Amino acid sequence: MLASLTITKTPKLMSLPLSSSMFRRLGALVVAAIALSGAPLFAHDMWIEPTTFSPKPGEIVGVRLRVGQDFLGDPLPRNPALINQFVVEDAEGRRPVVGRNGADPAGLLRVAVPGLLVVGYHSNPSAIELSAETFNQYVKEEGLDAVAALRARRGQTGGAREIFSRCAKSLVLSGSPNRTQGDRSLGFTLELVAERNPYTMGVGQNLPVRLTYESRPLAGALVVAMNRSNPSDKLTARSDKDGRVRFRLPRTGVWLIKAVHMVEAAPGANAAWASYWASLTFEL
């Protein structure tokens, strides 16, 4: 997405003989170092890529976190310093996604009952300082027109310090699809919610998706959908006044839908802007 940023691998921490508190401190330092270096932890999309989208009841599913672009991503190992929420919700309710610190997959879940599972990961905010060229380019590419216009009105032409959070979800189906089961809100700051169960759909049908910010519909946001088999052939739409977009999905396979929203950072945040990156994956 941003050609000026260097892609590097996330450091492997799982072999270090550290206590839990030492791991958290080191993890936070590593995350900050990666963010400040402009590595893909910030620069690209983040999504959930389960080891299977169609597990059997009782099966254990690995919940892999990926950071990259166009379905080419580096692993994001489990880091407790980053996790705000890491959950799965099914017909029996919500429970945490467990895992081992430093491991990839970052989480493991056992399918307790057949049906649709909604898996979600919400990160804590991380900070980054961006040059004017890099910040302006990414604001343009992510369709953040309101931010660009506000900076122009204020005569802000320099770089910017930003805090960013990831809000990723994935839909996994165990057993036969059921029209009465669907995606649901997990209460993430920025969230994509499929208003139709994609596992009940066929090729060429419309998938309505709603985008919310702080549990309210977000209008005018750029929403992008891509298929893993041909990620360069993207579908794009702007959310309407109800936060809704509709995508006619032209092929089977794994889909990723994403959106970014940016606001002015709260006082005391030691940053000018706060961004939220939402994603939703499923298989058609």
Predicted region positions:
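Bacterial N-terminal signal peptides that target proteins for export
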Residues: P11-L29
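Glycine-centered loop-to-beta-strand initiation motif
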Residues: A103-G107, S239-G253
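Short acidic/polar inter-strand loop motif in beta-rich domains
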Residues: N124-A132, V263-G268
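Short amphipathic beta-strand segments in non-cytosolic proteins
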Residues: N84-R94, L222-A237
